[in-house]
Curated annotation (Swiss-Prot):
Function: Probably phosphorylates lipids; the in vivo substrate is unknown.
GO biological process: phospholipid biosynthetic process
Protein name in the entry: Probable lipid kinase YegS-like
Cofactor(s) needed for function: Mg(2+); Ca(2+)
Residues that, per the record, bind ATP: 40, 66-72, 95
GO cellular component labels: cytoplasm; plasma membrane
Subcellular location: Cytoplasm
Residue sites binding Mg(2+) per the record: 215, 218, 220
DAGKc domain mapped to chain residues: 2-133
The enzyme's E.C. designation: 2.7.1.-
Stated family: Belongs to the diacylglycerol/lipid kinase family. YegS lipid kinase subfamily.
Cofactor details (free text): Binds 1 Mg(2+) ion per subunit. Ca(2+) may be able to substitute.
Highest rank taxon of the organism: Bacteria
């Protein structure tokens, strides 16, 4: 497979029976685009397929699935040497598709696949956590993380992103702030946080825009902390009038360190990571990604 033409499509196994996708792949193949398809079955498959694609000189690796699939593919690409690293394409097929949605990737499968193959590749940032794992979109901690990690799969499948909100309302009795300390470049905060969002991208949890100013090619991570001792009033004000909420703290830095006196959990593009200390560092321009020319996440 030549670097000038070939694409590997790594498809989440949950979407393997998608007939529209099958037809779109055939159409683009008929138009002269070589496309290899690989279907994931278990954790680690995507990384193996990325390695295979790089060894074969693929031009693009397309992550076909939700935010978790994009995360796994992007993390694997970050581990490929730069001279062999294919570009990343996005084909949103998940429940919420937060990263692809905020990047203005088309919902239409054929259009998204065409963009993933033919679109202009631009350098984008990715974030490294504790020198062992990655996220391309967002790390969220606190109550919001518990909701997204605990939301039942059937509810997500039936209602999409709205399911996170509904499940959250059902779990209001579990609202509990996390005490922590957060440091960054020219930033320091300590207190009780209901939700922490550290964004390379802008939205998480099924469409909640936690870091509205974030860009994926500015070399920065954007931080938003939702605070408040009276949690229900704070949450209501934050959701209805965010520009007026005294319970929002914002920051931006190439890195952030979070420490807590007890174990807290961060959700990294859907993957939970627990601990008492997190160091999150942006890797500027680490990946090439095929995005729309009007992508709002690019400066």
């Amino acid at each position: 497979m030549s670097r000038s033409a070939g694409s590997f499509l790594i498809l989440n196994g949950k979407s393997a029976d998608n007939e529209i996708l099958r037809g779109s792949v055939k159409l683009l193949r008929d138009q002269g685009h070589p496309i290899e398809v690989r279907v994931t079955w278990e954790k680690g498959d995507a990384a193996r397929y990325v390695s295979e694609a790089a060894d074969q000189g693929a031009q693009t690796v397309i992550a076909a699935g939700g935010d978790g699939t994009i995360n796994e593919v992007a993390a694997a690409l970050a581990g490929v040497t730069q001279e062999k690293r294919p570009a990343l394409g996005l084909l949103p097929l998940g429940t919420a598709n937060d990263f692809a949605t905020s990047a203005a990737v088309p919902d239409d499968i054929e259009l998204a696949l065409k963009l993933a193959i033919e679109g202009r590749a631009v350098p984008i940032d990715i974030a490294h956590v504790n020198d062992k794992t990655w996220f391309i979109n967002m790390a969220t901690g606190g109550f919001g993380t518990r909701i997204t990690t605990e939301t039942p799969e059937r509810l997500k499948a039936a209602l999409g992103g709205v399911s996170y909100l509904i499940h959250g309302l059902m779990r209001m009795d579990a609202l509990k702030a996390d005490r922590c300390e957060i440091r960054g470049e020219n930033f320091h905060w300590q207190g009780d946080a209901l939700v922490i969002g550290i964004g390379n991208g802008r939205q998480a949890g099924g469409g909640q825009e936690l870091c509205p100013e974030a860009l994926i090619n500015d070399g920065l991570l954007h931080l938003r902390i939702f605070t408040g001792e009276e949690l229900l009033p704070a949450l209501f004000t934050t959701l209805t009038q965010p520009e007026e909420s005294p319970n929002i703290i914002d920051g931006a830095s190439p890195w952030f360190e979070i420490t807590a006196p007890h174990e807290i959990t961060f959700n990294l593009d859907g993957e939970p990571l627990s601990g008492q200390h997190f160091r999150i560092v942006v890797e500027p321009g680490a990946l090439q990604c095929r995005l729309p020319p009007d992508c709002p996440l690019l400066k």
